[in-house]
Amino acid sequence: MRIREYTKNDLPFMTALWGNAFGDAEVLVRRFYELLPEMGTAFVAECNGVPVGMANVLCAVVCGQRCGYVYAVAVKPEVRGKGAGTALMKHCRRMFSRLCTLPASEGLYSWYADCLGADKVSCCIYETIAAGASDVEIKNLLSAEYAAMRSEYKLNTAFPLAWYEYQRELCRYYGGGMFRSGRSIACGYLEDGVLKIKECLGPTDFIPELCRRLGAEKAEIRTAFHAGKPFIAASFPLPETLNMCIALD
């Protein structure tokens, strides 16, 4: 098994593998890879010279230190269970001294702990708010505007502008976006009639009206909380106050 950094020639394979593994719209996957050079890099696993797997690693800053955020790891069905995924993760570990990720399912936390040493976990809780009408002012934000307002909150996480751009396009594709009301900001998308809010900073009193405008029955707001459900897994200690709710997921 050979692991190497991706090239543009790998993009058709990586785009197809992503779609088959995760079911995301091709237009979003293509946009991700357009932005990837500004966000980080990716690695490809080869078996006998044939690409069989991939792992994307994005740049993030956690508590003032750079780290790699592992995202959209996938291998072809015919090689699953043969070590391609583990080989990719071990390569990521060699290339980045500090790594974190959001496992796609609870069963993957132990796998990431084994192959990445990612045994430190942050947590979050989910709050539900019903839709309702009000005369509160709500504005759509561009990714740069959202990033600028987010920086005013002095959080312990930061990301490249391209990260916010991809977040915005993903959320807009699924009926949501990035919004502000007063000094509050929120980023989210629609899923089965629910506004899934990745992050809301500031008072949430505008959320009922935002739900109404977007046609959602209710909102589910993700908030960092040390005693909540497992969220980000990392190979380095995480503060209880870690706010990485805007993680790509």
Question: What is the meaning of each model-derived region?
Answer:
Residues 37, 43-45, 51-52, 58, ...:
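Core nucleotidyl-transferase/polymerase catalytic module
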Residues 89, 94-106, 216-225:
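Conserved GNAT acetyl-CoA-binding A-motif
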Residues 1-3:
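Extreme N-terminal starter segment of soluble prokaryotic enzymes
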